[in-house]
Amino acid sequence: ARRIAKAGVECDQVPPTKFFDKLFDKLVWKKVRARFGGNIRFCMSGAAALSPDVAEFIQMVGFSCYEGYGLTETAPLVAANGWAGPGKSRLRTVGLVANGVKVTIDTDAWDDPDRADEGEIIVHGPNVMKGYWNNEAATNEVIIEPGVFRTGDLGKLDKDGYLSIPGRVKSQFKLENGKYVSPAPLEENLKLSPLVEQAVLDGRNMKNTYLIVHPNMEAMKAAMQDAGVDVSGSDADICASQTTRDWLLGELKAKNMTAPAWKGYEVATSIILDPVEWSTDNDMMTPSLKVKLRNLLSHHEAEIAKIQG
């Protein structure tokens, strides 16, 4: 880790140069790389936000680790780390825009005065689809003109041209104090906890945010027992217990909901625990495994009302 920090290189592989680094690499990391076949040149991540901690660990093992961004409608690549060469990658971004593609940020689609440089990502280029098959209405919603596609994703371009994606424009919500919250990256952060299987952060038009969590029951019960917390009863009883909820919320506040990933107003003050896994079978997930937020909020309507007071 010190070797990588000293090199000042993000995402790219940093070969060991000093004696003890080489020795440790031979004794430990070489064996880890061998478990993956021994021939991996680099790792790519897409579809969801890549945790910087995960990326840095993969880099420490000895692989370059790059995050990219694209959509089916853009065939698919829009931006990526790694393609521009060594030293041209940046953590917490999806990299530089690909050759032949142009990205603009429509700030009119987003009205948070504290984040005025963010907006909807608009993709321009020959890679943009002509339209959705036999669905002119859906096509007209996203195709501004031929070769120009409205993604629905919230984005920001920094001064060096690196693109970052805080979330979806439509998934953002505003708190009572006027602050906007982008839940997607925060939910991914929560799912790094071994105690959490699925998580949703909400709080639209409320004073504070709250969580709905489907916990890893076995991991949570074991951790609670170690902490001296009673775990008797069924999974439903444990999840309904205020003691359990207070304990898990405290754990997540201490280990996940921390700066710089979380701003103070984003930190949840309440939690609802759902003992049942969200799936397509109970209509809580789409076929592409995205949470059906409306269904989930409706299912927990009574508990949400208690939080609202």
Per-region residue spans from a language model:
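Alpha-helical "lid/cap" subdomains adjacent to substrate-binding clefts that gate access
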Residues: 1-38, 217-259, 275
